[in-house]
Amino acid sequence: HHFFTGNGIGLNRFSNPISSPQTQTQTRSLPFPAIKAMKTMEGKVVCASGNKTVAVEVTRLAPHPKYQKRIRLKKKYQAHDPENDFKVGDIVQLLKTRPISKKKTFLAVPAPSRKSKKAGSSGELGIPLQSQQE
């Protein structure tokens, strides 16, 4: 009967839930980093004839269902190319975005070149190569 009259322990039960929405609003206002639920994919442009659209072929290694040998599987994705930058043969990275059309949910961006990483690794150590010493 304390619950209806407002006396005693009954009010203390409600004091805790009333304070919890305040803490929830504080946590929601914090700036959270963007969630990257999917890894970026890298592939080769195989068709660039459409306007602002490129077809990208992504190759991945997956185990064979029966023999478990890792085999190459290819899949084509339609990607958005807003500036029509890419041509057939370019290596691009696919970033997951909101759906742009029925089949386009990826954005094509230039892939970081692999050759520059290898060349820069020796310079990062600060030790000149033999060819640079002579």
From Swiss-Prot:
GO cellular component, one term: ribosome
Region (Disordered): 106-134
First-listed, main subcellular location of the protein, grouped into a coarse class: plastid
Domain of life: Eukaryota
Keywords, alphabetical: Chloroplast, Plastid, Ribonucleoprotein, Ribosomal protein, RNA-binding, rRNA-binding, Transit peptide
SUPFAM superfamilies assigned to the protein according to its UniProt record, in alphabetical order: Nucleic acid-binding proteins
InterPro entries: NA-bd_OB-fold, Ribosomal_uS17, Ribosomal_uS17_bact/chlr, Ribosomal_uS17_CS
HAMAP family from the UniProt entry: Ribosomal_uS17_B
Family: Belongs to the universal ribosomal protein uS17 family.
Name of protein: Small ribosomal subunit protein uS17c
